[in-house]
Amino acid sequence: MLKIIRAGMYTTVQDGGRHGFRQSGISHCGALDMPALRIANLLVGNDANAPALEITLGQLTVEFETDGWFALTGAGCEARLDDNAVWTGWRLPMKAGQRLTLKRPQHGMRSYLAVAGGIDVPPVMGSCSTDLKVGIGGLEGRLLKDGDRLPIGKSKRDSMEAQGVKQLLWGNRIRALPGPEYHEFDRASQDAFWRSPWQLSSQSNRMGYRLQGQILKRTTDRELLSHGLLPGVVQVPHNGQPIVLMNDAQTTGGYPRIACIIEADMYHLAQIPLGQPIHFVQCSLEEALKARQDQQRYFEQLAWRLHNEN
């Protein structure tokens, strides 16, 4: 078992996400920084998309109630296992009774804690990810709180050694494709979207990142029919300030879509702190597909290397 001593401000169970239910209004959910989740899981011998803890802004303390292995990835924060420093991107042994403590991150926003065997909570609609809107997944469909105890599954590996891997770097230059209504915005707004810095609003959450910057204006007042939405779509509501839809976003909407962030760059957004400028970089569909293929190839190679170690 894994006992939550101090839950932090926003800690949930997340995995690779909930697929195939968008027609029923069920959001994708899942880890916001998918590369960090996958690296943590692969380090401890789990499936890449196994359930783990997503910890926003640190300030977490957990107690391990069984021996095993864990890995901490994502945001760079000061972490300690009892009195020993813990590096992110490393697989390390844990003993029953030991406590892992995370302070507020110095770099990034979200950390991921995976344990060998995974967080063993029951899947709902094919996923263990917490959906706070619907109240499903994770532990009772809610944020974790002090005193919670989470079961740990059986490890797939009989033996391991301490090991670290290089994490994917994140930055504030985010590649995106023009959206379906891109050409409904005036030229000044199109230029501003790509050339002007955007600030992440404090009203941002796992549903959407609200951006602050130059007001974007359309050249038409036509109303749009409701359309399907996915994480990464950049909507522009009536106030002219963009909203980037994130993993917990609604599945339909009617605001104009000025752009869509490429899948391979979504993890950058998960780690950008409030107040840091965001710059969008226009790319082609071919570049977006290549970026996704390169990222998939990286994880295939990492999984092979870790599976065949020793």
From Swiss-Prot:
Listed under subunit, the entry gives:
Forms a complex composed of PxpA, PxpB and PxpC.
Write the record's keywords in alphabetical order, separated by commas.
Answer: ATP-binding, Hydrolase, Nucleotide-binding
Q: Which PANTHER family match?
A: 5-OXOPROLINASE SUBUNIT C
Main enzyme class = hydrolase
Catalytically driven reaction(s): 5-oxo-L-proline + ATP + 2 H2O = L-glutamate + ADP + phosphate + H(+)
Name the UniProt record assigns to this protein: 5-oxoprolinase subunit C
Name the domain of life this protein comes from.
Answer: Bacteria
Q: What is its EC number?
A: 3.5.2.9
The disruption phenotype is: Deletion of the gene slows growth on minimal medium with ammonium as nitrogen source.
